[in-house]
């Protein structure tokens, strides 16, 4: 294990910049950590680097594929032959062509996506498939203005016009018009080099957190739920990728933590599910609801010891003129 580096994973709310800080707060007797809203897997990746046994879970299937590729996977990489095979077929009409032509991508690009997916599914190894889908995630997002699938087609076309982009923003953003294959190959080495073995057997799940916590065992649970009052529509941002992988239009999930009025109830439900675990680590920020005082009160019931740490954190939100500067909170709970 030669100091593997977390690859480029565009993910709103990614904890890459503070993953080290969070891991440093883990109690010394922790050996197994469950990352139950794993998202872009930056925390899970850092925990794996530090030798922990990791359980990664996310309700989005594309995030589950990231966890399979980067956390559970200990050795499988994509070879040059694998990549040549993935891109060996001419474009073909299929699910993406039928449902998403001139919605997020041009029709011919959707035909390319259909051909690529068909070949990825022919790879005879789960981890190779996961790596390929992780790289296709990167490619599709690189071609998408603002890196999220909540932009109207008219805006997509406008922002992919390099002359318009240059006149408006001083940058052509030519990468939006590079091919899927170009982006896939450009990022191949960094994703392959992120595959490593820390000596442990890891697990990945694609479940609702409230179901997951009933059947896993871990010394500590790390929670990074969507923050209410922020850009937190993760199904809207990335649900298209789940539809692409499955070949069927996916529906938004329940228990999404987006509704301020529902958030307190969901946290109460979550705390109830966490009772079997010794340590809880909860990431949140200083502008969301429940607020710091409300969360502290909920978490400290029944004699639980709660410590709250904070660090400045800048959220890079694509499509926003100003980066959002908030204070990142980390609630450390010892369930005594």
From Swiss-Prot:
Pfam families: MethyltransfD12. The keyword S-adenosyl-L-methionine applies. Coiled coil: none annotated. Its EC number is 2.1.1.72. One of its GO terms (biological process) is DNA restriction-modification system. One of its GO terms (molecular function) is site-specific DNA-methyltransferase (adenine-specific) activity. It catalyses: a 2'-deoxyadenosine in DNA + S-adenosyl-L-methionine = an N(6)-methyl-2'-deoxyadenosine in DNA + S-adenosyl-L-homocysteine + H(+). Signal peptide: none annotated. InterPro entries: DNA_methylase_N6_adenine_CS (IPR002052), MeTrfase_D12 (IPR012327), SAM-dependent_MTases_sf (IPR029063). SUPFAM superfamilies: S-adenosyl-L-methionine-dependent methyltransferases (SSF53335). It comes from the Bacteria. Both this methylase and M1.HphI protect DNA from cleavage by HphI. This is Type II methyltransferase M2.HphI. The gene is hphIBM.
């Amino acid at each position: 294990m030669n100091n593997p580096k977390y690859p480029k994973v565009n993910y709103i709310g990614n904890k890459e910049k503070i993953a080290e800080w969070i891991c440093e707060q883990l109690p010394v007797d922790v050996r197994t950590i469950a990352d139950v809203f794993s998202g872009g897997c930056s925390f899970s990746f850092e925990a794996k680097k530090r030798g922990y046994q990791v359980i990664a879970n996310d309700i989005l299937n594309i995030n589950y594929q990231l966890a399979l590729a980067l956390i559970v996977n200990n050795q499988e990489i994509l070879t040059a032959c694998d990549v040549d095979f993935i891109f060996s077929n001419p474009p073909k009409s299929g699910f993406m062509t039928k449902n998403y032509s001139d919605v997020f991508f041009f029709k011919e690009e959707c035909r390319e996506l259909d051909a690529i997916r068909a070949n990825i599914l022919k790879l005879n190894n789960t981890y190779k498939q996961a790596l390929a889908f992780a790289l296709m995630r990167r490619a599709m997002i690189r071609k998408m203005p603002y890196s999220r699938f909540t932009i109207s087609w008219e805006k997509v076309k406008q922002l992919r016009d390099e002359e318009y982009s240059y006149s408006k923003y001083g940058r052509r953003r030519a990468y939006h018009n590079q091919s899927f294959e170009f982006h896939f190959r450009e990022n191949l080495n960094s994703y392959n080099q992120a595959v490593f073995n820390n000596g442990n057997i890891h697990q990945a799940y694609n479940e609702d957190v409230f179901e997951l916590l009933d059947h896993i065992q871990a010394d500590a649970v790390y929670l990074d739920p969507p923050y209410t009052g922020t850009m937190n529509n993760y199904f809207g941002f990335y649900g298209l990728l789940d539809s692409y992988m499955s070949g069927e239009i996916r529906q938004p999930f329940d228990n999404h933590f987006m509704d301020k009025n529902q958030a307190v109830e969901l946290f109460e439900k979550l705390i109830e599910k966490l009772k079997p675990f010794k340590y809880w680590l909860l990431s949140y920020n200083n502008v969301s609801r429940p607020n710091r005082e409300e969360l502290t009160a909920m978490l400290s019931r029944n004699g639980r010891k709660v410590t709250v740490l904070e660090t400045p954190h800048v959220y890079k939100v694509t499509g926003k003129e100003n980066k959002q500067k908030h204070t990142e909170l980390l609630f450390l709970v010892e369930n005594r």
